[in-house]
Amino acid sequence: MARSRGSSRPISRSRPTQTRSASTMAAPVHPQQQQQPNAYSHPPAAGAQTRQPGMFAQMASTAAGVAVGSTIGHTLGAGITGMFSGSGSDSAPVEQQQQNMANTSGQTQTDQQLGRTCEIDARNFTRCLDENNGNFQICDYYLQQLKACQEAARQY
């Protein structure tokens, strides 16, 4: 006894539906053109990159910022402490705050001037190192100048 299916047509499977849209637009073509150097062309400049400040210049700038921030922080802290200290006279804290602000602006200007002075020495030293491939012996003069500037700045 043979088995029969009952129909002569094969069973068709349903195709899965496509979930993304089909596009007939082609991707843009970017022709890669390579320039052939001619006999008169100049080679590309190797030093055309922008230079970042050196490590010592960044340290000097950071030190100047720390000094200014410290001065302002101490002044504000002293002012807030003076407000809550409970002194009987109101005019004395106001005068003291004005005097502290005057001292702070003077210190800030001095700190900025010293920071700028040492920043110049730091730039000179790092420039020398860059030009001489990091040779400290050649740049010792600039290193001594930077150390002297930093020592002078510590006294203030």
From Swiss-Prot:
One of its GO terms (cellular component) is cytoplasm. Keywords: Disulfide bond, Mitochondrion, Transit peptide. Residues 84-110 have a biased composition (Polar residues). The keyword Transit peptide applies. Its main location: mitochondrion. InterPro entries: CHCHD2/10-like. Signal peptide: none annotated. Coiled coil: none annotated. Residues 1-50, 78-110 are annotated as: Disordered. A motif (Cx9C motif) lies at residues 118-128. Residues 1-21 form a transit peptide. It is found in: Mitochondrion intermembrane space. Present with 6960 molecules/cell in log phase SD medium. This is Mitochondrial intermembrane space cysteine motif-containing protein MIX17. It comes from Saccharomyces cerevisiae (strain ATCC 204508 / S288c). The lineage of its organism: Eukaryota, Fungi, Dikarya, Ascomycota, Saccharomycotina.
